[in-house]
Amino acid sequence: MTRALRRVARCTRAQTGIEFTLVLPLLLFLLLGFIDAGRLIWTINRAEKATQMGVRYAITTDMVAAGLGSYVFTQAGLPQGASIPTTAFVGVTCDSTACTNKGAGPPPGYSATAFANLVQRMRFFYPEIAPANVVVEYDNSGLGYAGDPNSPDVAALVTVRLTGITFQPMTTYAILPPFQLPEFRSALTMEDGTGTVAN
């Protein structure tokens, strides 16, 4: 054993150094690739968890589409106790600036405070979220009835979407721009839709 070590110590050909120089970049690239894969999975997990917690918050607190919560569908000619058809309410889409109807339906209104609170809740799980990345949708689920005394009349299917999230791998940082991750979404049926506190 010591004879082999002495022979290596006396070697002046630098073969080992050259081999190490050739292999080191590949090993570093492989190591950074493993780290990038872990970072990507972590980013996807945080984005998914942010949408899950966002929709849980959205169904139990004030509606972003503020007009939907107080609208009584008997005003639209539906008899008291009738289920809300898609001809009376299709859905509402809300972003960081306004809410718009997807078709027929009541004036959606817009609560900037409710939207800001929702985004803030999602940032607990993914701090890089900007308001422009969040979209909230209220779709007709077939639940609810006109003139519900406990309001809202419609128990909408609430979907929180997270769009425009990018990821920059370390291995291609200098040569490629960040790439777009797919849209993340989570949906639950509306509960009471009022209040400012949710757990």
Predicted regions and their residues:
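C-terminal juxtamembrane segment of a hydrophobic transmembrane alpha-helix
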Residues: 21-42
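Proline-centered flexible-loop/turn and helix-kink motifs
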Residues: 14, 25, 127-130
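Membrane-proximal amphipathic alpha-helices
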Residues: 39-48, 63
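A broad detector of short, well-ordered amphipathic alpha-helices
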Residues: 12, 48-52
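N-terminal leader/signal peptides at the extreme start of proteins
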Residues: 1-13
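Short, conserved structural patches
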Residues: 2-3, 52-199
